[in-house]
């Protein structure tokens, strides 16, 4: 069987793709906007 290689670090995940990081840049805000329009339950991590 294959190993589960993805560990997942919550601090790193927040720093890369958290809400506050998204709001910093123009493109990040565009991501938030499009996810809101689509009706995503989770806008950001």
Swiss-Prot record:
Please give the InterPro entries that the UniProt record associates with this protein.
Ribosomal_bL34, Ribosomal_bL34_CS
List the residue ranges forming a coiled coil, or say none.
none
Instruction: Tell me the superkingdom of the source.
Output: Bacteria
Q: Which GO terms describe its molecular function?
A: structural constituent of ribosome
Q: Any idea which UniProt keywords this protein has? A: Ribonucleoprotein, Ribosomal protein
Q: Could you provide one GO biological process annotation from this protein's UniProt record?
A: translation
Here the segments flagged for biased composition (Basic residues) are: 10-39
The disulfide bonds in this chain are none
Where in the sequence is the signal peptide annotated?
none
Query: Which residue ranges are recorded for the region named Disordered?
Result: 1-45
Q: Can you supply one Gene Ontology CC term for this chain's record? A: ribosome
**Membership in a protein family:** Belongs to the bacterial ribosomal protein bL34 family.
Q: What is this protein called?
A: Large ribosomal subunit protein bL34
Q: Which organism is it from?
A: Prochlorococcus marinus (strain MIT 9301)
């Amino acid at each position: 069987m294959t190993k589960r290689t993805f560990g997942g670090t919550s601090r790193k995940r927040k720093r890369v793709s958290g809400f506050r990081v998204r709001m910093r840049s123009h493109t990040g805000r565009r991501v938030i906007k499009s996810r809101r329009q689509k009706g995503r339950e989770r806008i950001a991590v």
